[in-house]
Regions:
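Structured beta->alpha junctions
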Residues: 5, 32-33, 105
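Short, surface-exposed alpha-helical segments at coil->helix boundaries
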Residues: 9-13, 133
């Protein structure tokens, strides 16, 4: 597991350590300046030879990560979710299992869960980059990004109130 760090990086390292308490081997990629999600992955891509799962740390879900796979010939696979209140317009459409940039209908929101091929980052010389704008969108335009819609439990935790609301709802179960 690679954890990309900037804000409170030392505290996270001190808390998680090498991961052995959790049955993991954790490596850290420290950013002195924010590189963006794509830049953070690009900065640590040397750790990966095979496709890997990228998961935003501000999400909570019961999505089964074991079910993720990358179709032969594709550079990425994105998990989409129904649009939340803060993104009613959605991000992208899904057409025949591919991320569709042309369609204006039935757009969904990118969950922050994906499986990525290291090849997605091969041609890049960028240092600061966004995963969507600089890597996934150009690949999707070439038909190289598949996707799926997940309609199960999913929360994007953008604020302390979001975390408190989730904690309260989980306490009720």
């Amino acid at each position: 597991m690679i954890i990309n760090l900037h804000h409170f990086g030392e505290k996270i390292i001190n808390f998680l350590g090498d991961g052995s308490n959790y049955g993991l081997k954790i490596s850290y990629s420290l950013e002195k300046e924010l590189l963006g999600t794509g830049g953070g992955i690009w900065n640590s891509i040397h750790h990966f030879q095979d496709p890997f799962i990228a998961l935003s740390s501000d999400t909570w879900t019961d999505f089964n990560l074991k079910g993720l796979s990358l179709e032969k010939g594709k550079l990425a696979h994105m998990v989409l979710v129904p649009n939340p209140e803060h993104n009613l317009a959605g991000d992208v459409a899904l057409l025949n299992g591919l991320i569709d940039l042309q369609s204006g209908n039935n757009k969904y929101t990118f969950s922050g869960i994906s499986i990525l091929s290291p090849e997605l980052f091969n041609e890049s010389k960028v240092f600061k980059a966004e995963l969507w704008d600089d890597f996934l969108k150009p690949a999707a335009a070439k038909g190289l990004v598949s996707g799926e819609l997940y309609e199960g439990a999913f929360e994007n935790l953008n604020t302390i109130k979001d975390v408190e609301r989730l904690d309260a709802s989980l306490g009720e179960e």
